[in-house]
Amino acid sequence: MAVDTTTEAKAIARYIRMSPFKVRRVLDQIRGRSYREALIILEFMPYRACEPILKLLRSAVANAEHNQGLDPTTLVVSQAYADGGPSLRRYRPRAQGRAYQIRKPTCHITIAVAPQVEDN
């Protein structure tokens, strides 16, 4: 299966309030799959990370359709990755006047779709 990366369309979601490790677990399942297959997988996976990824995948396909005039039925998820964003720092009061730091991680998710090229 060859993918034409010259006509790649992508979408980026920034500052998603979720750990990048948890998001990567879901992205690994859809990378390299067709758009329709990825939609079905995301609909039925039990993870919280599926919701922003599903929204982002639909956005990437809409970008491909609107900006480059590509057919959604031929699209394949060519790239899918999550990078770490800035962590929100919160403090939890502890005994004897101490405070423990709580890190609330964020991530930036990128999904790119490209049309599948038929091998001759």
Swiss-Prot record:
Instruction: Output one GO BP term.
Output: translation
Q: Which domain of life is it from?
A: Bacteria
An annotated Gene Ontology molecular function: structural constituent of ribosome
**Stored InterPro entries:** Ribosomal_uL22 (IPR001063), Ribosomal_uL22_bac/chlpt-type (IPR005727), Ribosomal_uL22_bac/org-type (IPR047867), Ribosomal_uL22_CS (IPR018260), Ribosomal_uL22_sf (IPR036394)
* Gene Ontology CC, one term: cytosolic large ribosomal subunit
Q: Which CDD domains match?
A: Ribosomal_L22 (cd00336)
Give the SUPFAM superfamilies listed for this entry. Answer: Ribosomal protein L22
Q: Which UniProt keywords apply?
A: Ribonucleoprotein, Ribosomal protein, RNA-binding, rRNA-binding
Recorded hits in Pfam families, A to Z, give: Ribosomal_L22 (PF00237)
The UniProt entry, under HAMAP family, shows: Ribosomal_uL22_B
Q: Can you tell me which family this protein belongs to?
A: Belongs to the universal ribosomal protein uL22 family.
- Subunit annotation: Part of the 50S ribosomal subunit.
The function of this protein is:
This protein binds specifically to 23S rRNA; its binding is stimulated by other ribosomal proteins, e.g. L4, L17, and L20. It is important during the early stages of 50S assembly. It makes multiple contacts with different domains of the 23S rRNA in the assembled 50S subunit and ribosome. The globular domain of the protein is located near the polypeptide exit tunnel on the outside of the subunit, while an extended beta-hairpin is found that lines the wall of the exit tunnel in the center of the 70S ribosome.
Q: What is this protein called?
A: Large ribosomal subunit protein uL22
Gene source species: Crocosphaera subtropica (strain ATCC 51142 / BH68)
- Gene expressing this chain: rplV
